[in-house]
Design a protein with these regions (language model features):
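Generic structural signal for small/hydrophobic residues in well-ordered secondary structure
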Residues: 6-7, 41, 80, 105
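Short, well-structured N-terminal submotif of metal-dependent ribonuclease cores
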Residues: 1-34, 45-60
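Active-site neighborhoods of divalent-metal-dependent phosphate/nucleic-acid chemistry enzymes
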Residues: 68-113
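Short, hinge-like loop/turn segments at secondary-structure boundaries
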Residues: 47-52, 87-88, 129-131
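Acidic, PIN/NYN-like endoribonuclease modules and their adjacent C-terminal/linker elements
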Residues: 1, 102, 106-131
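A generic structural signal for short hydrophobic patches within well-formed alpha-helices
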Residues: 10, 38-41, 119
Length: 131
């Protein structure tokens, strides 16, 4: 399965949460990390007390697991517009960064792994919501 990792899932993985680590090991044939997630993580690192440690851990995660980073390009931007319009039309709201994450997921045809239940309103992607 192509797994696209949300910010909260990376945080769980880095903390060694067994459910998350096991799910990724069992189902993650290919692991993708949207650039938007990397931005959210770096924001947390910068405002935290262990910036260098956390940045090194993220780099190791990307390098050791051969994680593919999904960049925001014109194709992702078009998918963002499609998803956002669909959400507006049905009166659903999710954080803007999460629309970008969903668009990134749609771009690679992956399944989003997250703890955020609001992704269930995004019809264009498959989502696994960890409890």
């Amino acid at each position: 399965m192509k797994l696209v990792i949300d910010t909260n899932v990376y945080t769980d993985y880095a903390a060694g949460v067994p459910e998350t680590v096991d799910f990724m090991a069992t189902h993650g044939e290919t692991i993708f990390l949207p650039a938007v997630v990397i931005g959210e993580l770096h924001f947390g690192f910068v405002k935290g007390k262990r910036q260098t440690f956390n940045e090194k851990k993220l780099k190791q995660f990307i390098d050791l697991l051969s994680v593919d980073v999904i960049l925001v390009d014109a194709d992702v931007a078009r998918k963002y517009a499609t998803i956002y319009l669909s959400l507006v039309n049905k009166g659903a709201k999710i954080p803007i960064n999460d629309v970008w994450i969903a668009a990134s997921c749609m771009e690679v045809g992956g399944t989003l792994l997250t703890r955020d239940k609001h992704f269930a309103v995004v019809d264009q992607i498959e989502t696994v919501i960890l409890e």
